[in-house]
Amino acid sequence: MEIHPEQTALCEDLIAPCGMNCGLCIAYLGRKNEINREGFHRTYCEGCLPRGKGCLYMAGRCARLENGAVRFCSECPDFPCRRLRNLDRRYRTKYHMSMIENLRDIQKNGMEAFLRKEAERWSCPGCGEMICCHNGLCLRCSLDVLKNDKKYCWGIR
């Protein structure tokens, strides 16, 4: 598989402490693809770490993350904590991904192998751009689907 430099999932800085790959998030991909120019009204995000405010889901709720004692939740003796388990359950149910599995994969196989796996799993077969984990669409190839149904999520209408 050819790896395109613009693939957002291939950046370690976009892996949040909770295990979320921010490069697959609608707020990040929307910014990258400038979907608001197409009539959307979405909040854009650079990713949890690049925006300099830490993990969106754990910020202010985890002293170890706040004081820099850990980079990833998986480095914490309380891993996985209740908050992360709840977040993980929601993402597994709605968005076909698991933050806990991501973190365990990084622990077991390393960041480079994890990023390669993410690129293979989430690349659009049409253009190579990342598929959004929140709706299952490539925002480069399938933006018209989202225009017709702004609440589209993984084929469920």
Could you tell me what each predicted segment is?
Residues S142-Y152:
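Short Cys/His-rich micro-motifs in 6-15 aa windows
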Residues E2-Q7, G23-K32, L56-G60, L103-M111, ...:
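Short Cys/His-rich Zn2+-coordinating modules
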Residues E34-R42, N86-E112:
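Short, surface-exposed polybasic-and-hydrophobic patches located at secondary-structure transitions
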